[in-house]
From Swiss-Prot:
This is Probable serine/threonine-protein kinase PBL2. InterPro entries: Kinase-like_dom_sf, Plant_Ser_Thr_Prot_Kinase, Prot_kinase_dom, Protein_kinase_ATP_BS, Ser-Thr/Tyr_kinase_cat_dom, Ser/Thr_kinase_AS. Residues 86-369 form the Protein kinase domain. It comes from Arabidopsis thaliana. Changing residue 253 to A: Increased sensitivity to the pathogenic biotrophic bacteria Xanthomonas campestris pv. campestris (Xcc) in vascular tissues.
């Protein structure tokens, strides 16, 4: 696909282990993982409780990455057969990177099977001229070919035949969080489901951040959070992932790349990347879950507003919090839990990166919120008044500052892309 890297090219990623401390149990898991067959028929991972593990190779050649024993190398014809020649009626979504199709493979051999039989998968086909180039494609294969966790999307295999670049993932029937929050006609998510999704996403980020060789996700957003049939959240699209700082380094200096509205301000301004950059992005998504609004909103007469700038004045005020709560919740949420979630978002969005909590700390709070939000749990409902979307935006017209050093923006991508793509900062 265009100017591809040759087989000896290196991928810029440092050591990273697929094992982290569990924020809920406090126990470590080891790098001794084994793949087993889950309910869907696809390979999942079981973990040993051995606390000893070592780092993965710092740099790997393309040949080493593509020879991962955890991934199947598909031929282009196999994926053509699996998707019925990429027929439009199998199209799941489309974005700047290309298209995603539903496909079927045999559970045992992983070869193409008849539509409706075998295992359903999502096949992402990159456009040669798309925004997600070979380097990002290879980075995703590199990370997901080694990392395995219940809250990371499972990469089944890939195709690198000629200029064709495809990725084969487990199928996520509920699609992206972005669709559920913002797509017209979507069934509103209950408060309990929103907290469940937040917990799952937080577990995925905690796993990446607390691995022995840290991984910074760098593109955390609603479009990259995919949901299975039970609304369990899994992180997808690792094309922008970056190895965390090593040794005495406190940050990684890198080209500014991410998504407009989600990227941490200090990263946009300086290119200094830390795990706290991901924490900021998580705060934005948590704010989207609370408010039902996009990170960047241009619905008010075409003027673009930052959700963070607009909502921040209300997050720490119990009496005014109802003004930013998603009206689609119909007032059905615990007042105390909503205020705790709002305060947590405020902490994640602290302009001073050092004062933001760790993802493991965020996870502890979210798990407490999830436990009291489960159906059947008694809590105080907070009735929010009915008001029109645009009138709320006018209550606090903090306009997004366009003098920030933002770079070129392109659409983001995920195995099951959203109907409307979030702009990516480059």
């Amino acid at each position: 696909m265009g100017n591809c890297l040759d087989s000896s090219a290196k991928v810029d990623n440092s050591n990273h282990s697929p094992h982290a401390n569990s924020a809920s149990s406090g126990s470590k898991v080891s790098s001794k993982t084994s793949r087993s067959t889950g309910p869907s028929g696809l390979s999942t991972t079981s973990y040993s409780t051995d606390s000893s593990f070592g780092p993965l190779p710092t740099l790997r050649t393309e040949g080493e990455i593509l020879s991962s024993p955890n991934l199947k190398a598909f031929t282009f014809n196999e994926l053509k057969n699996a998707t019925k020649n990429f027929r439009q009626d199998n199209l799941l979504g489309e974005g700047g990177f290309g298209c995603v199709f539903k496909g079927w493979i045999d559970q045992t051999s992983l070869t193409a099977s008849r539509p409706g039989s075998g295992i359903v998968v999502a096949v992402k086909q990159l456009k040669p001229e798309g925004f997600q180039g070979h380097k990002e494609w290879l980075t995703e294969v590199n990370y997901l070919g080694q990392l395995s966790h219940p809250n990371l999307v499972l990469l089944v295999g890939y195709c690198a035949e000629g200029e064709n670049r495809l990725l084969v993932y487990e199928f996520m029937p509920k699609g992206s969080l972005e669709n559920h929050l913002f797509r017209r006609g979507a069934q509103p998510l209950t408060w309990a489901i929103r907290m469940k999704v937040a917990v799952g996403a937080a577990k995925g980020l905690t796993f990446l951040h607390e691995a022995k060789s840290q991984v910074i996700y760098r593109d955390f957003k609603a479009a990259n959070i995919l949901l299975d049939a039970d609304f369990n959240a899994k992180l997808s699209d690792f094309g922008l992932a970056k190895a965390g700082p090593t040794g005495d380094n406190t940050h990684v200096s890198t080209k500014v790349i991410g998504t407009h509205g989600y990227a941490a301000p200090e990263y946009v301004a300086t290119g200094r990347l830390t795990a706290k950059s991901d924490v900021y992005s998580f705060g934005v998504v948590l704010l989207e879950l609370i408010s039902g609004r996009r990170a960047m909103d241009n619905s008010n007469g075409g003027n673009e507003y930052s959700l963070v700038d607009w909502a921040t004045p209300y997050l720490g005020d119990k009496r005014k919090l109802f003004r930013i709560m998603d009206t689609k919740l119909g007032g059905q949420y615990p007042q105390k839990g909503a205020f705790t979630a709002a305060n947590l978002a405020l902490q994640c969005l602290n302009p001073d990166a050092k004062l933001r909590p760790k993802m493991s700390e965020v996870l502890v709070t979210l798990e407490q919120l999830e436990s009291v939000a489960k159906p059947g749990t008694k809590h105080t409902q907070m009735e929010s008044p009915r008001f029109h979307h645009s009138s709320v935006m006018q209550k606090s017209p903090v306009r997004y500052s366009h003098d920030r050093p933002l770079l070129h923006m392109t659409p983001g991508a995920s195995p099951l892309p959203s109907y409307t793509q979030s702009p990516r900062v480059r």
